[in-house]
Amino acid sequence: MVALTEIKEYLRIPFDDEDTFIQAIIDAGYIYLENAVEYYHELYESNNSFSNLADFWVKTQWCPTAFDNREGMLAGNVQLSYTARSIITQLQLYTYKEGGE
C-alpha cells in the first residue's frame, strides 16, 4: 500500500492540513480496485507485479485525479482517464492461482 508521505511527495504537498483527506483518497483508491478486480486481496498479497501495478495506479492515476477534482469525488462523479482505465483492465486480467503466481 502506498504511504501518505509518498503521495504527498508525488503531489508536491508540503503541508499537513489535508492529511486526513489525502489518506481517505488513498483508501478509496484501494477500495475501488477491490471492487473492480476479482481476488484482489489474494493477488495483491501473492503477486509482486500485481501489487506494484496496483500501487502505481493509486499513486499516479487515482490520487492526483481525486485530489484535483475533490468536488466531483465527493459527489461520486469519477472520471478516469484512458490510462487509468487501461491499468485497471490489466489488473483485471491477472488470475489468482492458489499456491503461487
Task: Cite the ranges covered by each PLM segment.
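Divalent metal-cofactor coordination and adjacent catalytic microenvironments
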Residues: 1-101
